[in-house]
Amino acid sequence: MQNRLLLIGGGHSHVEVIRRFGLNPEPGIAVTLVSPDRHTAYSGMLPGYIAGHYRFEDCHIDLETLCRSAGVTRVAAAVTGIDLQRRIARCADGAEHAFDVVAIDSGSTPVIAGIPGAAQHGMPVKPVPAFLDYWTTLRAAARNAPSDLRIVIVGAGAGGVELTLAMHNRIRGDNGRAQFTVISDGPTLLAAHPAGVQRRFSAVLRERGITLRLNAPVQKATAESLVLGSGEVLRADHVIWVTGAAAPAWPRECGLLTDAAGFIVVNAHLQSPSHDCVFATGDIAAMTSAPRPKSGVYAVRQGPPLTENLRRALRGGTLLEYHPQRRALALISTGDRYAVASYGRLAFGGAWVWRWKDYIDTAFMQRYRVAETS
């Protein structure tokens, strides 16, 4: 009888698990991926795609082809819960999938639950497929607009700033009409990065005519505006939510140990302390012994140790500990072919940094392109 490994979500860690099981199959183990989308975006290249520097296939991994080449069964469905006692995952379509060991790498969505009207008005940047459909519509609207569209991005972290600059670059190249505003409830943009990075991006936003509003929490969203904490009404034709990460409700509801925000708690083995048959990585996981920001960099690094521990868990072996790096290099693009590096207190930028970033990103994607065509 085969052991059953179930992978929930096609995130950055899981594509590496699939690749490695394809390169080195495990006798007696049947691997299944459950993910609603055929293509998974590589977050490092997504702003470049928005900006017009990459094609869709340059920055998306075809999960169907990758799974087929690795001997992994792919199920196109979204998991809505787990019966931990029976070891069964339930999907939105009513299907159930049994497992002996399950790994969860299904990502997160922007935090909007506490803002009245946010779910009805505006577009969260995740899930990515829905956002990309919206982006196509927005580009067409900007090309055909008789006057500037008022586009507001809520969130001034690296994701929000990089996305804003990418959209600005593409719409400008389309000869579209748009005025961008970035707003944040905090006192600075790029709060997780050093002052040198903040200064560089503040200058870039100014140079491109993009308005930055700090200390401006959103209290309410309507069809035509955002109401700020000060009571000011900010008119908006389009609102894009790039706020902090939010977890889905089902991990907590099914009985997994989660943190205060609902993310799945994992130990140094990337394993749930409450249920040893469950592993989690990426945004949906909270490594409480070594907290790190929600970033694709860490999800990528978790792929190899996750693969090894899944093999060991299925064999009944001793698990390895994973110790994430204390700080990660961030290469943040400015919409054009220029990027700024942020590492600890260091900050430097240039066209050569963008080429460096492009080299790293395309090399990452090539790993999965080789697997897809094998």
Language model segments and positions:
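C-terminal auxiliary extensions adjacent to catalytic cores
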Residues: 336-374
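Beta1-alpha1 glycine-rich phosphate/pyrophosphate-binding loop at the start
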Residues: 1-72, 162-193
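FAD-site-proximal beta/loop scaffold in flavoenzymes
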Residues: 120-147, 233-238, 242-301, 308-309
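Rossmann-like NAD(P)H-binding beta-loop-alpha module
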Residues: 135-181
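Internal hydrophobic alpha-helix adjacent to the cofactor/substrate pocket in enzyme cavities
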Residues: 297-325
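A Rossmann-like FAD-binding core segment of flavoenzymes
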Residues: 74-81, 169-268
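Short hydrophobic core segments
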Residues: 8, 97-109, 127, 218, ...
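FAD-binding core/adjacent interface of flavoenzyme oxidoreductases
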Residues: 2-4, 69-152, 240
